[in-house]
Design a protein with these regions (language model features):
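A broad structural signal for short, well-ordered beta-strand segments within beta-sheet-rich domains
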Residues: 1, 50-53, 111
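Glycine-centered loop/turn positions within well-structured domains
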Residues: 18, 26, 107
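Short, flexible helix-adjacent loops and helix caps
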Residues: 13, 25-28, 84
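Extracytoplasmic/periplasmic, Sec-exported soluble proteins
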Residues: 9-12, 31, 35, 90, ...
Length: 121
């Protein structure tokens, strides 16, 4: 499971939409009911707005309610430099907690659901 999270982190830091979306299931839904296409557009916009992205991820909890399903609570520290601040010291930093559900797809794991949690909640 850590390998999958690390690979997603690497793809995001490389700002590679295609590589990141490889980890997202076709039937993905977020906490607002939006699907894979909406997530792709959001990620593309985020990558355009932030010329550099650095993530720190910590898996707080992993549960396996079924052999082919994993539920994770993940904390992600995000630091980015906005495209228009390329020569400035301005950084945008946030910490978010996520509930993420993954489903086994052959030898791989794909995200089928993700929702942002309130910090500490």
């Amino acid at each position: 499971m850590r390998h999958t999270v690390d690979a997603m982190e690497t793809a995001a830091e490389a700002r590679d939409v295609g590589d990141l979306m490889e980890f997202i299931a076709a039937d993905f839904r977020d906490g607002y009911g939006q699907g894979r296409d909406e997530l792709r557009r959001y990620v593309q916009g985020y990558f355009i707005a932030n010329q550099s992205i650095h993530l720190l991820t910590r898996i707080e909890q992993i549960d396996f309610p079924h052999p082919d399903e994993a539920r994770l609570q993940v904390t992600v520290g995000m630091v980015g430099r906005e495209a228009d601040a390329a020569n400035a010291w301005n950084l945008a930093a946030d910490v978010h907690d996520f509930d993420v559900t993954l489903r086994r797809d052959g030898e791989d794991w794909r995200v089928i659901h993700a929702a942002r949690r309130r910090p500490g909640g």
